[in-house]
Amino acid sequence: MVGSKMAASIRERQTVALKRMLNFNVPHVKNSPGEPVWKVLIYDRFGQDIISPLLSVKELRDMGITLHLLLHSDRDPIRDVPAVYFVMPTEENIDRLCQDLRNQLYESYYLNFISAISRSKLEDIANAALAANAVTQVAKVFDQYLNFITLEEDMFVLCNQNKELVSYRAINRPDITDTEMETVMDTIVDSLFCFFVTLGAVPIIRCSRGTAAEMVAVKLDKKLRENLRDARNSLFTGDPLGTGQFSFQRPLLVLVDRNIDLATPLHHTWTYQALVHDVLDFHLNRVNLEESTGVENSPTGARPKRKNKKSYDLTPVDKFWQKHKGSPFPEVAESVQQELESYRAQEDEVKRLKSIMGLEGEDEGAISMLSDNTAKLTSAVSSLPELLEKKRLIDLHTNVATAVLEHIKARKLDVYFEYEEKIMSKTTLDKSLLDVISDPDAGTPEDKMRLFLIYYISAQQAPSEVDLEQYKKALTDAGCNLSPLQYIKQWKAFAKMASTPASYGNTTTKPMGLLSRVMNTGSQFVMEGVKNLVLKQQNLPVTRILDNLMEMKSNPETDDYRYFDPKMLRSNDSSVPRNKSPFQEAIVFVVGGGNYIEYQNLVDYIKGKQGKHILYGCSEIFNATQFIKQLSQLGQK
């Protein structure tokens, strides 16, 4: 977690819970003597998405998992091996599970449900086990409460499968029925409940009024309250994971609605992780690259040509990624270059020592040199695995950063980033918006649309009809689809009635001149023409709201936020206790989808706060392309 390591992070907790489950629900002891029990793991797509960012195939093998298979794939019987199931308790999954029992596929069955299973479905399994004469083989049935995906020490999303169900579009559809909305809210609340069970803490909840976030808050408060009231079955007594409580103070949960800030998800970004997510295929911590054939013959402004797929996992053990995922891109390019140079120096040293070791000659100088170098070579050889790992990471980040750089150069993303920052901070613009939209060399139609929407959202005063027509013509001429603008117009009119538009603070990005080091001809990265923009910390709306509530600051933006304490006997919306001290731990959850720009902004904000922790969560994580698609669908209604 960002801040001091006072408590187990959510990644640690979910990993511990998964390892315990794979160990037949007995706490997993590291370095325990003897071989692990060999077993098969059967999961559905939900289970796969939860496990894959946390446990590698090697870690699964170390836990005794010889085979991991999808529940709905064709599976042969392996009758002398126990099977650990990790699935959602859906109708279709339960049917398949019962079929497995009837077909007597495995020696024994350890059934783990990602989310709590209902009594009626449990009875279906019991009946199937009876009919198949397999009651004794069903060894354990567990509700795991793990229905969320952890992507970072301090970041989680609700789901990846069926995410359309909880998407921004689903929540904001004008024709959504009350029943459909209930289903969406219940899905979100179920996952958040699982999150807090895994965290082992009951939060204080704050949320804005009259939004989907408020509906989530009311339902979550009720669900936590009911669980706490049932003392015998409460999931919050004791610490089942034995990893030490979150901390003595309860965490704050801030539920915000995506509608408080629609500009940030459309923003062109400048930090490494957010750029990778924006321009590449980055999904559950894995980036899929198509090896480029270069951009020679493509017209300027077009995306580079592509071929050959390759995928890389960007994991917590990747030191370079952990250190630089929040860095501005030119800094990343420079660091890759430095790593490469230091690796080459180490490699040359090993080669030099090897050649010295092959020295002929009997003279004493050579002999003493030999003994001196033996020690050096021994140390060099022992650091060889480390060297090879370093090489692997350098190659990985060279490929990923090069792919990002191709997009930056082909689409002039540095220009977009700088221009949007100026719009959002109300700084004087050095070039008219129409010029940027009309420039055939700058960006794709989608880049232009993103820029215009940010301008439209951030403007205190909407442009006049005459001006708007002019912009629309320029956008259409540039090949843009205007559906997203249709929706944003309606949204802005509605938001204006509800409240004032979000302000983005007065940020500036300072161009620092081009990077001298990366500009060297020996560099992997030809950064020519790319601005070396340096970021100044500014709080985005979500960070500002969190800051107000975490530090108990009085601010018109958050003063009317509702307050829920599920541990209080009466559930009236009591006003905030006056004598509250600031919170040390907080979870910000965005109903309607989040992004890596917001996540990075929170990480940067908390760096300056000693001993405080923040977690960022969202119903889904989307990049600007995916978000524009949702806005477009809403605009076509």
Swiss-Prot record:
SUPFAM superfamilies in the record: Sec1/munc18-like (SM) proteins (SSF56815)
InterPro entries: Sec-1-like_dom1, Sec-1-like_dom3a, Sec1-like, Sec1-like_dom2, Sec1-like_sf
Compartments, as annotated in UniProt: Cytoplasm; Endoplasmic reticulum membrane; Golgi apparatus, Golgi stack membrane
GO biological process terms held by the UniProt record: endoplasmic reticulum to Golgi vesicle-mediated transport; intracellular protein transport; negative regulation of autophagosome assembly; post-Golgi vesicle-mediated transport; regulation of ER to Golgi vesicle-mediated transport; regulation of protein transport; response to hypoxia; response to toxic substance
UniProt entry keywords in alphabetical sequence: Cytoplasm, Endoplasmic reticulum, ER-Golgi transport, Golgi apparatus, Membrane, Phosphoprotein, Protein transport, Transport
Expression (tissue specificity): Highly expressed in testis. Detected at lower levels in brain, astrocytes, heart and small intestine.
Similarity comment: family membership: Belongs to the STXBP/unc-18/SEC1 family.
Protein name: Sec1 family domain-containing protein 1
UniProt lineage: Eukaryota, Metazoa, Chordata, Craniata, Vertebrata
Gene it is expressed from: Scfd1
